């Protein structure tokens, strides 16, 4: 990164928890000192599209209070955080658009050995986000709206890491010609 800085290039970051620790400082540096940073919890083009669909569906579901929403994310056994940064970003997209939900809560966690801890029981204004750790799964995110009559389910299933790599390259190219605090919503304006 020192080489990038010495050449005046911006940074492209994907690191869980990093923005919680450094987000305000990075936004300030971009705004006040002309720095450039492209940050995302997930660089996959498919996840960017899925996120837009997720937000739109949440807006629609405001008109249908008999549907309750939940999420399950599945990742490889080496992933340490639960829920994933992508799941948190998707949950925040729902909370921004679905008036009856005010916060997400950790649901169940299925460990690599099959042990399940936690619960999906929560207050009516909360949305459970559950996590499964199994095999070498790159990432699956499923959002479910459930009623007594039926279910509406949307899923993004990463088959490999190619989509993440493509998105990171597109973000780097975008950063070369744009300034400030940037993200996937700047790169893809759905």
List where the protein language model places each region:
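Rossmann-fold dehydrogenase core element
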Residues: 26-44, 61-71
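Rossmann-fold NAD(P)-binding glycine/threonine-rich loop
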Residues: 16-37, 48, 53-56
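Single conserved hydrophobic/aromatic residue that forms the stacking wall/gate
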Residues: 2-13
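C-terminal substrate-binding/catalytic lobe of Rossmann-fold NAD(P)-dependent oxidoreductases
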Residues: 65-190
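Loop/helix-junction capping segments adjacent to catalytic residues or to phosphate/diphosphate-binding pockets
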Residues: 12, 20-23, 47-48, 80-81, ...
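Short, ordered loop/turn segments at secondary-structure junctions
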Residues: 17-20, 42-44, 74-76
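Rossmann-like NAD(P)H-binding beta-loop-alpha module
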Residues: 49-66, 82
